[in-house]
């Protein structure tokens, strides 16, 4: 097995663990979300996790041949992921402590365009490269992203109450 693949897979999972730990500490009220050092560490962890996929999947030890249409589908997923993730980030104009409920633009259709983008990014790289071994870290990452979404929805419902419940009923994911 390619040692680069193992190293990058471990870095991916480390980034995932750091972000998940942050979310748990945030839920418990045990982390200062305005602390720039904390933000930098979590942001770097997310970058490592997300940037590991274009390195990891081409080196996957259990790759299978992917038909052209599947490869292109994976690439379209990656491009859509970038549009959703960066579009959501630009629209939010921040990542933490946003004092109002954003319900326009991408957020008028998707409650979590950035999380949707992360999921498409991961799945797109796996599909594009037929990366069978990478399905394990992909499942862990996507499962955690869905968990982060749940934590975020609980926090938004606590903060915005009925306004958020109405918004949630009218949008997907």
Residue ranges and their predicted role:
Residues 1-100, 120-173:
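Membrane-anchoring alpha-helices and their flanking helix-loop junctions
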Residues 103-116:
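Histidine-centered phosphotransfer motif of kinases
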């Amino acid at each position: 097995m390619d040692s680069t693949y193992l190293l990058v897979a471990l870095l991916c999972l480390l980034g995932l663990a750091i972000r998940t730990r942050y979310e748990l500490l945030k839920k418990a009220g045990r982390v200062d979300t305005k602390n720039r050092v904390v933000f930098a560490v979590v942001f770097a962890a997310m970058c490592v996790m997300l940037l590991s996929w274009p390195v990891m999947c081409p080196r996957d030890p259990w790759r299978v041949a992917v038909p052209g249409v599947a490869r292109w589908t994976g690439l379209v997923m990656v491009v859509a992921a970038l549009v959703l993730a960066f579009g959501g980030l630009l629209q939010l104009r921040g990542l933490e402590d946003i004092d109002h409920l954003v319900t326009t633009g991408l957020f008028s259709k998707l409650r979590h365009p950035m999380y949707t983008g992360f999921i498409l990014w991961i799945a797109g790289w796996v599909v594009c490269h037929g990366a069978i071994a990478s399905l394990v870290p992909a499942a862990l990452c996507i499962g955690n992203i869905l968990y982060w979404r749940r934590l975020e929805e609980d926090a938004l419902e606590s903060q915005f109450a009925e306004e958020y419940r109405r918004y949630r009923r009218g949008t997907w994911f």
